[in-house]
Structure formats: structure tokens, C-alpha cells
């Protein structure tokens, strides 16, 4: 009788992103070649799957931001605009206090980090706008809220307001202030 050898399934691009997420959460800078080696794939394959470090970091942050948004919406208290503002407050507080994210912002130069998280060319901002737009549209269609502009425009305004106050230290030398962000959002949503 022949002995069966169990083989590990071949790694996939998703495995690389999952491994990168674990490294990011430990507060480590992502190194595509090192991650590829850890996963048992060639450097060329790792770069083909991930792009460069900046692209991979953006994918990881986008995946974390997506999950955070869903959780904040689910946990939001209140009705109507209060519910929207509670979800926004929860998201901003989480991002401001998430040590691996703050480590990333402190480690990278401001231009690089903003290009990843607060630019139309990065993966995070377009995702955030899309998620906000979909949620706002659902709330409008269900009659829970009324907006003075279309859901896309409001989503864009809310995301950019969040960025302005969450990253105030990086982009304007101001102190981060979540309460001010929520106050401005309240004015936008009236």
C-alpha cells in the first residue's frame, strides 16, 4: 500500500493579502518580497500578485476599512441622521485609535500615506465613498433620512470631511478632532 503524502494547497493571491493583513495588524511595514518568501512563492509571483508595497498596503487598509464601515453601520444607534452620525463617530474613533493604522501613518511620509488612503487613485477613498453612497441611498429609499443632495455627493462630502479631520495633523498641522468632524457632518446632513 502506497503512503499518501498530504500536500498544502498552492498559495493564492488572497493568501498573500491575508498574510499582509496579519503583518500590518502587528504594526509591521509590508515587504512584498519577504511576504512572498514567507508564503513560499517567488519574488516575481509575489510582486505580480500584490503590485508594489504601496499597492498592497492600500489593499490591506481598504479591506480593514470595509469591514470597519460594515461593523459601524451595524452597531450604530439612533434613527435617521443620528444613526448616520453615530456610525461616522464610531468609524472615526476606531481609525484614530487603531494602533497599527496610526503606526502606518507615522511611519510613512504624509504624501505616500495620503496617496494610499485619501486619493481617488488609492483603493481606500473610492471604496469609502461607494460604501457611504450605498448606505445613504438605502436610508433615503427606506424613508429613514432625506438629503439635500444626491447620495453620491453627500457620501463624497462625508468622506472628505472625515479625512480632513482624521488626518489634520498630516495635511494641515492641525490637531485631529473627531468632535469637530461630527459637528461639520451634522451641518452637511441637515
Where do the PLM segments sit?
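C-terminal peripheral helix-coil segments that are non-catalytic and often amphipathic
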Residues: 1-6, 93, 130, 134-142, ...
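Short, amphipathic alpha-helix enriched in basic
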Residues: 10-34
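HTH DNA-binding helix-turn interface
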Residues: 24-29, 47-59
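Append "Primarily bacterial transcriptional regulators
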Residues: 34-38, 46
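Central "turn" residue of the DNA-binding helix-turn-helix
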Residues: 39-40, 51
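Hydrophobic alpha-helical connector segments
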Residues: 59, 72-101, 154-158
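Amphipathic alpha-helical segments used for helix-helix packing
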Residues: 96-119
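Amphipathic alpha-helical packing segments from all-alpha helical-bundle domains
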Residues: 115-144, 152-159
Amino acid at each position: 500500500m502506497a503512503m499518501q503524502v498530504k500536500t498544502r494547497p498552492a498559495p493564492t493571491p488572497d493568501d498573500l493579502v491575508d498574510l499582509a493583513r496579519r503583518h500590518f495588524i502587528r504594526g509591521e511595514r509590508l515587504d512584498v518580497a519577504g511576504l512572498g518568501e514567507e508564503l513560499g512563492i517567488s519574488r516575481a509571483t509575489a510582486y505580480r500578485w500584490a503590485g508594489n508595497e504601496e499597492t498592497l498596503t492600500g489593499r490591506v487598509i481598504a479591506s480593514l476599512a470595509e469591514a470597519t464601515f460594515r461593523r459601524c453601520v451595524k452597531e450604530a444607534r439612533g434613527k435617521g441622521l443620528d444613526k448616520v452620525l453615530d456610525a461616522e463617530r464610531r468609524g472615526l474613533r476606531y481609525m484614530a485609535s487603531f494602533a497599527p493604522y496610526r503606526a502606518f501613518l507615522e511611519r510613512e511620509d504624509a504624501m505616500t500615506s495620503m496617496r494610499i488612503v485619501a486619493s481617488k487613485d488609492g483603493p481606500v477613498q473610492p471604496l469609502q465613498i461607494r460604501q457611504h453612497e450605498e448606505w445613504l441611498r438605502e436610508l433615503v429609499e427606506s424613508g429613514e433620512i432625506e438629503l439635500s443632495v444626491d447620495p453620491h455627493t453627500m457620501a463624497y462630502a462625508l468622506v472628505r470631511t472625515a479625512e480632513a479631520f482624521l488626518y489634520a495633523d498630516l495635511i494641515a498641522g492641525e490637531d485631529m478632532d473627531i468632535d469637530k468632524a461630527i459637528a461639520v457632518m451634522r451641518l452637511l446632513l441637515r
